[in-house]
């Protein structure tokens, strides 16, 4: 069993430590996997497309620009991620349906909750490098998240 604290101790020079605080909404407090990315502004169509197409064990990282205008993830999209056996979702933005999300058996991190839904225009970008939390989120890098924080590495760190 790995912990981000132990990985930081062992691989300090080989990883990035996210400086942004997230709240945990999913059932899993600890999760890891290869990163896939989506960048959107108040529109979650590409989030849904990513969840429907990513391979098992992936962590979808969504950069919503920390917008407080709407939620980018709710119970319906989280159920898709759980059904497809994704490891987790990290949202630089907000979620809704939080009472249902706590029963979804994946990791879900976000800044907080917002009750209103996003627009559905399909605008945004997928599979690009993202910058938030003081780190670079690159597709196919590895992310590790638990109760102590979020770290990123170019290679798999746990055994």
Curated annotation (Swiss-Prot):
Q: What is this protein called?
A: Putative 4-hydroxy-4-methyl-2-oxoglutarate aldolase
Q: In terms of domain of life, where is this protein from?
A: Bacteria
One annotated GO molecular function is:
oxaloacetate decarboxylase activity
Entry annotated with the keyword Membrane: no
What's an example GO BP annotation here? regulation of RNA metabolic process
Q: How does it assemble?
A: Homotrimer.
According to its UniProt record, which reaction does this protein catalyse? 4-hydroxy-4-methyl-2-oxoglutarate = 2 pyruvate; oxaloacetate + H(+) = pyruvate + CO2
Organism of origin: Bacillus cereus (strain ATCC 10987 / NRS 248)
What EC number(s) does the entry state?
4.1.3.17, 4.1.1.112
Q: What class of enzyme is it?
A: lyase
Respond yes or no to whether keyword Metal-binding is given for this record. yes
The residues the record assigns to binding substrate are: 74-77, 96
Per the record, the similarity remark reads: Belongs to the class II aldolase/RraA-like family.
Q: How is the cofactor bound?
A: Divalent metal cation.
Q: Which cofactor does it need?
A: a divalent metal cation
Residues holding a divalent metal cation: 97
**What is this protein for, i.e. what is its function?**
Catalyzes the aldol cleavage of 4-hydroxy-4-methyl-2-oxoglutarate (HMG) into 2 molecules of pyruvate. Also contains a secondary oxaloacetate (OAA) decarboxylase activity due to the common pyruvate enolate transition state formed following C-C bond cleavage in the retro-aldol and decarboxylation reactions.
Q: Which UniProt keywords apply?
A: Lyase, Metal-binding
